[in-house]
Amino acid sequence: MSSQALDSAKVAFIEAAIEHGVLLFGNFTLKSGRQSPYFFNAGLLYSSSLLSTTAQAYAKVLSSSRIPDFDVLFGPAYKGISLAAVSAVSLYQQTGKDIGYCYNRKEKKDHGEGGTMVGAPLKGRIVIIDDVLTSGKAIREAIDILKASPEAKLVGIVQLVDRQEKGQSGSGKSTVQEVEEEFGVPVEPIIGLDDIVKYLESSGKWEKELQEVRKYRAEYGVQRS
């Protein structure tokens, strides 16, 4: 793990997530059945202050060299909708880059404008905004939506948290690494497990939690390439 200090956007996001109970430490059973010493609940990202901090962190990643140039943010229903919207606003405020955003309906609308897509036309270079990639099922469903639009080209994915742990496929790779290899696009997080560990180390207030997270990482963790 790099000894480089966390940047201010990551620190602000982690501190806000802890303060609002979005990032929790304890004993949690994941969908995979694993017992995890930490849990990230993106469903609690509903206050204006926390959304602002989250959007700023997204915008920083979106404007970095790690994400190719793009035209539209796509936020998969439901959690991705608000995340894409606030990220588009923050990106414009930070950089002046004027991009569109869109999202899908899970139920097709047969009146008014109709269809399953809302917002900017799904064409050009697309970046998907999501929260946490677990099994990879949801992100593959989102990519299938893009594939149905011949004018859309996926160029990247930005997620809230990379758990940096081995997936369930037996490959020894994380879900993020598998998605990157399968689709040939970068998957960049606002924070990863290494960042959480680094924050706990630097704070000096979470020694018990730090030890548990380190143990979990030693058993299940993978390094980002």
UniProtKB/Swiss-Prot annotation:
Effect after changing D69N: In strain: J25
Residues holding 5-phospho-alpha-D-ribose 1-diphosphate: 31, 78-79, 105-106, 109, 111, 130-138
Record keyword Glycosyltransferase present: yes
PROSITE patterns attached to this UniProt entry: PUR_PYR_PR_TRANSFER
Gene Ontology BP terms: 'de novo' pyrimidine nucleobase biosynthetic process; 'de novo' UMP biosynthetic process; pyrimidine nucleotide biosynthetic process; pyrimidine ribonucleoside biosynthetic process
Matches recorded under InterPro entries: OPRT, Or_phspho_trans_dom, PRibTrfase_dom, PRTase-like
This enzyme's EC code(s): 2.4.2.10
Binding, orotate: F39, F40, T134, R163
Keywords: Glycosyltransferase, Pyrimidine biosynthesis, Transferase
Listed GO MF terms: orotate phosphoribosyltransferase activity
Catalytic function, reaction form: orotidine 5'-phosphate + diphosphate = orotate + 5-phospho-alpha-D-ribose 1-diphosphate
Pathway involvement of the protein, from the record: Pyrimidine metabolism; UMP biosynthesis via de novo pathway; UMP from orotate: step 1/2
Enzyme class, first EC level, given as a word: transferase
One GO cellular component term noted in the UniProt record for this chain: cytoplasm
Role of this protein: Catalyzes the transfer of a ribosyl phosphate group from 5-phosphoribose 1-diphosphate to orotate, leading to the formation of orotidine monophosphate (OMP).
Family: Belongs to the purine/pyrimidine phosphoribosyltransferase family. PyrE subfamily.
Subunit (UniProt): Homodimer.
NCBIfam families in alphabetical order: pyrE
HAMAP family: PyrE
Name of the protein described by the UniProt record: Orotate phosphoribosyltransferase
Organism whose genome encodes this protein: Cryptococcus neoformans var. neoformans serotype D (strain JEC21 / ATCC MYA-565)
Primary gene name: URA5
